[in-house]
Amino acid sequence: MKFKVIVDSCGELTPEMKQDERFASAALTLEVGADTIVDDETFDQADFLRKVAAYPECPKSACPSPEIYQKGFETDAEHLYAVTLSSELSGSYNSAELGKNLVLEEHPEKKIHVFNSKSASVGETLIALKIQECEEAGMEFEQVVETVDAYIESQHTYFVLENLETLRKNGRLSRVKALVASALKIKPVMGSTPEGSICQLDQARGINKALVKMVDYVKEREPHSSDKVLAICHCNCPERAQMVKEALLERMQVKDVIILDTAGVSSMYANDGGIIVVI
């Protein structure tokens, strides 16, 4: 095997990636009250969303241990990569770096690189697919790293939340503001900063108007999109994801489109009805 990519479980894998031994997932764990949930193939989104809705505090996540990454890197692949959730949002990047160093202490000849996605969810998915594209084009390890780093810098993440409870529970939105926003049906349009943290771009009354604003932002910020892959991730709302896809494709050209359902960590952030767009 020439290369292997480990993606932490905030990044959803496509069905094809799940069947490809060159891709692996490093599971984060989620805590809702006394319940500990592993974000792997056993994750039950509907059950998780019910638990989150019923629990008064914000769910918590714990990143994969360095040993999990270490074990993932202990393979005969020539080139090894990890793609993690933004280091501004999680300790997964630091954990992967520690896992890499544990392997290099024993095998200094190995070629391993950890990418800080500065994104989340399908942003990580697209980065993993970019690594595959570079490897299959026959690039040297150092050229893959350079090309993918440049791709990460060009990538933008956007999302709209139907449900503001996670923002309220984690303190990003006060209870009063959350109540007012919910009463007025105000939905925030969010995005990523260049450093990989979260910012509010805009807001609108009603989910559909917020989605239109998000589409406007994507179109405005991506004038040269014809060679890019568009990725959309939804939390339990496939029809909404399809609507966003159609609205974007009416206004811009892209190379391909991927639509996936949120796994565990992304479900925690997006909550029921949330939409994430990365390009």
What are these regions (language model features)?
Residues 4, 10-24, 29, 89-92, ...:
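Mixed-charge interfacial surface used for oligomerization/domain docking
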Residues 76-77, 107, 225, 252:
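A structural signal for short coil/turn segments at secondary-structure junctions
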